[in-house]
Amino acid sequence: MATKGKRNIYVGPADHGHAGKPLNVEGKALGVVRPGALVAEAATGIDENAVAATIFGASRLWADKDQQRTKTVDDDWAINENMVAIRARSGEFLNVLVADAQTITKSGTPLSSNADGTLKIAVTPATVGVTSEEILAYSDEIITTSGVTLVRVVVA
């Protein structure tokens, strides 16, 4: 992931309205959690989000990298570690994990949950005969992913 030049998960707000500070959430990692993964809170901790894109109301919570121990976006959180996630606000920019084989041809492409901690190109109501999906973010770069890749997005 870092070979693509991405070193951070939180990139910042669009308007500097929050002084460049993310909203952090701490909790115990319930499994191995990858930085940039879409995660969900449970009573006992935080785990990668396995909720389908057609289930609306998902929290916009992404695993941060372990900055306290100077780790990188390539270093996963281990089971039972006290981890940090970012509760993203609309308009903030993050580098998040996008699933393999996603061809993002324009900036602003809507992205939804892939039910494994990654995002994928969303199915929108304009697609006839399919169920729409909750849009969590919009791409802020053009890329074709080969493997799970960090992609810069703006939170919906």
Features from the language model and the residues they span:
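Surface-exposed, low-hydrophobicity beta-strand/loop segments enriched in small/polar/acidic residues
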Residues: 1-156
